[in-house]
């Protein structure tokens, strides 16, 4: 029986939180399909959502617009629910180049990808948790709308082992091979098994810290035990165990054979169409490529690019929605769309980009038309599949407002009593010199400044100018990778420099309580960077500081500026009235620095001897590494760890294990 959610927090709901929690729960219990939580920056939206999840006790999926915010949410949810299953589901590609054809230059680009094993393990862990228990929170990126294995086939492939079960060793080994586990008696790692006499050790694909030992006696399962794969130490015995497939895309042999026959029929039909249109080159290319794939599938059970035949492998009809993570979420599940004004348009845009690339491949004979069904969900399909949904944003979009029927749940008053920033509009003519004097005032009292410009060129020039005039300044732009971006934000908070200049990167989800001033240059130039929503989000970056202030430089007040200023002043007035009524004195936030990089660390390892008692490994020397270099370092340390274990030097191996664990958490946060 699955346990209930248990929320761990030193805080109690305060400000607008209790009312928001009550209204959200009331709406969900009354069967409302869509609700919108308009929560200002720093009002504790994540804490409100965590309370709703804990009170209603329903499996939940949280959709975030990017990996950085997903990692931040995952870390926060792990702290709120350390005793429950908090899982992480994002794209497992470190690098991905889809196959494509460029007709103008007659260039075919082969698919090339690099899979991150640790994130793959976390994805498998997420689906396992959804299938086995109800106290689950899965934090996902838009990767959740892409095709996954069919839950029914995935469940059918599982290997159930029970103490006392009559089964011979060969049958277990054959079933493990069908699940795509490989035998490796030398190096015991995730997704492998080893055999020693009548003992089979299995390292589950969804685990990174424990393995299963199956002990047989005369074709009977005598004992099932969980053990530490590194030290070999037995932890406890279990009466039964389910081994899940190594990949979501595993398919039974009979289904593969059936799919092959269906592919042959489609190939024959497509060849006739191409020949009728005198496309001889395309016909030859398609026949050659498809026949090769069919031979590979017959011999090995899979082929390169097998996902292009997913319609047949999953038994779907033409145009049917692909199976996704949403198919694993129970019918009474809950969906939270974080920063919905960004996430919802993303979901709508994924299908169209994918479709145009594949249509070219089909037209020129690189793929069968059925490859078009290997795709992300369409927006209508997402709407049809989504369970009860809460949209969370400081600036909800039109879609969320329409779906919620205009009935918005506001969370404007912060538990800390902090007010929205004061806003001033100043002329453009003197904006740079005026900004420089404001920076000097802030730097003198150890506060930070964010500056947002319209173009990359302007950001670079401004950075040079401020630097020449003695300001400690850095520039954040799209060419900087995620790890560097996290490092720059961390350095800003630590006071390594005082001013951060950016274009469109200083918006959703960046928690920087040290920032007391946000300067928006050329605020009167209407456009998506200076829309009402963008302005409110950017102004909100100063809302976590006691002295928060926003300066908008413009020679006129545009409609967007007027709306953004009006909305901010409305919120500020409401917050002020609440504070005066209850005699609340605003308090500054004291958020730990490096939260994202320390992803999920408070829950370091489970129970049992030696697990939770290890000292925190020192990984500071690796914090400046790029994702690629960090991945290489993890592999090196893992190789050393296994060498120590084989030499029975378990203390050194355990130290490296903890170090690897922390570096993996860091890798997730920055990739």
From Swiss-Prot:
SMART domains: DEXDc, HELICc. CDD domains: DEXHc_UvrB, SF2_C_UvrB. Residues 631-666 form the UVR domain. Coiled coil: none annotated. Residues 431-593 form the Helicase C-terminal domain. GO terms for cellular component: cytoplasm; excinuclease repair complex. Residues 26-183 form the Helicase ATP-binding domain. One of its GO terms (biological process) is nucleotide-excision repair. ATP binds at residues 39-46. A motif (Beta-hairpin) lies at residues 92-115. It is found in: Cytoplasm. One of its GO terms (molecular function) is ATP hydrolysis activity. It comes from the Bacteria. InterPro entries: Helicase/UvrB_N (IPR006935), Helicase_ATP-bd (IPR014001), Helicase_C-like (IPR001650), P-loop_NTPase (IPR027417), UVR_dom (IPR001943), UVR_dom_sf (IPR036876), UvrB (IPR004807), UvrB_inter (IPR041471). Keywords: ATP-binding, Cytoplasm, DNA damage, DNA excision, DNA repair, Excision nuclease, Helicase, Hydrolase, Nucleotide-binding, SOS response. Pfam families: Helicase_C, ResIII, UVR, UvrB, UvrB_inter. The UvrABC repair system catalyzes the recognition and processing of DNA lesions. A damage recognition complex composed of 2 UvrA and 2 UvrB subunits scans DNA for abnormalities. Upon binding of the UvrA(2)B(2) complex to a putative damaged site, the DNA wraps around one UvrB monomer. DNA wrap is dependent on ATP binding by UvrB and probably causes local melting of the DNA helix, facilitating insertion of UvrB beta-hairpin between the DNA strands. Then UvrB probes one DNA strand for the presence of a lesion. Belongs to the UvrB family. The beta-hairpin motif is involved in DNA binding. Forms a heterotetramer with UvrA during the search for lesions. Interacts with UvrC in an incision complex. This is UvrABC system protein B. It comes from Yersinia pestis bv. Antiqua (strain Antiqua).
């Amino acid at each position: 029986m699955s346990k209930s959610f248990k929320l761990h927090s030193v805080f109690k709901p305060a400000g607008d939180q209790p009312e928001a929690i009550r209204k959200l729960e009331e709406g969900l219990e009354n069967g409302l399909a869509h609700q919108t939580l308009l929560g200002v920056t720093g009002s504790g939206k994540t804490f409100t959502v965590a309370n709703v999840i804990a009170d209603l006790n329903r499996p939940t999926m949280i959709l975030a617009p990017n990996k950085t915010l997903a990692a931040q949410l995952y870390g926060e949810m792990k702290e709120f629910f350390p005793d429950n299953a908090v899982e992480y589901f994002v794209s497992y590609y470190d690098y991905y180049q889809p196959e494509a054809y460029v007709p103008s230059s007659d260039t075919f680009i082969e698919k090339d990808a690099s899979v991150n094993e640790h994130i793959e393990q976390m994805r498998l862990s997420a689906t396992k948790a959804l299938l086995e228990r109800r106290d689950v929170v899965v934090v996902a990126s838009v990767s959740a709308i892409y095709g996954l294995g069919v839950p029914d086939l995935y469940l059918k492939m599982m290997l159930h082992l029970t103490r006392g079960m009559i089964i011979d060793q060969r049958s277990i080994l054959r079933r493990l091979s069908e699940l795509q586990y490989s035998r490796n008696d030398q190096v015991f790692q995730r997704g492998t098994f080893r055999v020693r006499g009548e003992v089979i050790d299995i390292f589950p694909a969804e685990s990174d810290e424990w393995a299963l030992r199956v002990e047989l006696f005369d074709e009977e399962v005598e004992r099932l035990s969980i053990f530490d794969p590194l030290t070999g130490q037995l932890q406890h015995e279990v009466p039964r165990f389910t081994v899940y497939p190594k990949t979501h895309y595993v398919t039974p042999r009979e289904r593969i054979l059936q799919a092959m026959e269906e592919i042959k029929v489609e190939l024959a039909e497509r060849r006739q169409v191409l020949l009728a249109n005198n496309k001889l080159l395309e016909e030859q290319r398609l026949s050659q490529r498809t026949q090769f794939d069919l031979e590979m599938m017959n011999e090995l059970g899979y082929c390169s690019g097998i996902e292009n035949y997913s319609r047949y492998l999953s038994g779907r009809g033409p145009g049917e929605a692909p199976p996704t993570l949403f198919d694993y979420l129970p019918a009474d599940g809950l969906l939270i769309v974080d920063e919905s004004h960004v996430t919802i348009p993303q979901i709508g845009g994924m299908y169209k980009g994918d479709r145009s690339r594949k249509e070219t491949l089909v037209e020129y004979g690189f793929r069968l038309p059925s490859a078009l069904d290997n795709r992300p969900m369409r927006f209508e399909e997402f709407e049809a599949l989504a369970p009860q949904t809460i949209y969370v944003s400081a600036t909800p979009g039109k879609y969320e407002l329409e779906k919620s029927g205009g009935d918005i749940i506001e969370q404007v008053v912060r538990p800390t009593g902090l007010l929205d920033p004061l806003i001033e509009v100043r002329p453009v003519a003197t904006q740079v010199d005026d900004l420089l004097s404001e920076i000097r005032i802030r730097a003198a009292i150890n506060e930070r400044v964010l500056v947002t410009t319209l173009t990359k060129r302007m950001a670079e020039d401004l950075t040079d100018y401020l630097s020449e005039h003695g300001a400690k300044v850095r520039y954040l732009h799209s060419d900087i990778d995620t790890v560097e971006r996290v490092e720059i934000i961390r350095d800003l908070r630590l006071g390594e420099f005082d001013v951060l200049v950016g274009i469109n990167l200083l918006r959703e989800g960046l928690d920087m309580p040290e920032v007391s001033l946000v300067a928006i240059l050329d605020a009167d130039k209407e456009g998506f960077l200076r829309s009402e929503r963008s302005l409110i989000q950017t102004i909100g970056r100063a809302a976590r500081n006691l002295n928060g202030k926003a300066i908008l430089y413009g020679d006129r007040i545009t409609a967007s500026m007027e709306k953004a200023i009006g909305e901010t002043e409305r919120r500020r007035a409401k917050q002020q009235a609440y504070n005066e009524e209850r005699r609340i004195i605003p308090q500054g936030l004291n958020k730990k620095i490096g939260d994202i990089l320390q992803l999920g660390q408070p829950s370091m390892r489970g129970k049992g001897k030696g697990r939770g008692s290890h000292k925190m490994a020192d990984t500071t020397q690796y914090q400046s590494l790029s994702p690629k270099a960090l991945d290489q370092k993890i592999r090196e340390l893992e190789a050393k760890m296994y060498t120590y274990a084989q030499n029975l030097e378990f203390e050194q191996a355990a130290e490296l294990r903890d170090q690897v664990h922390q570096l993996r958490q860091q890798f997730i946060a920055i990739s």
